């Protein structure tokens, strides 16, 4: 239930700060958001899949921690990211 390589490459290319940037908070949050959105569609059909739901909650928690880190480091980048991602924070 992960993203395919083309989708990941497109997300990395869109949010990267420089050419080979895969570890910046923006890229990590964008990848986690795509995975979270993918899993939400999965739960529409599989309501009792508690094992995957736990993984979803871990991803949401990790994304929240990355967003809190970015908010403390650089508020402008944080606000730009939540606007581009459509997150309601």
Curated annotation (Swiss-Prot):
Disulfide bonds: none annotated. GO terms for molecular function: rRNA binding; structural constituent of ribosome. SMART domains: Ribosomal_S15. GO terms for cellular component: cytosolic small ribosomal subunit. The keyword Cytoplasm does not apply. One of its GO terms (biological process) is translation. Keywords: Ribonucleoprotein, Ribosomal protein, RNA-binding, rRNA-binding. One of the primary rRNA binding proteins, it binds directly to 16S rRNA where it helps nucleate assembly of the platform of the 30S subunit by binding and bridging several RNA helices of the 16S rRNA. Forms an intersubunit bridge (bridge B4) with the 23S rRNA of the 50S subunit in the ribosome. Belongs to the universal ribosomal protein uS15 family. HAMAP family: Ribosomal_uS15_B. Part of the 30S ribosomal subunit. Forms a bridge to the 50S subunit in the 70S ribosome, contacting the 23S rRNA. This is Small ribosomal subunit protein uS15. It comes from Photobacterium profundum (strain SS9).
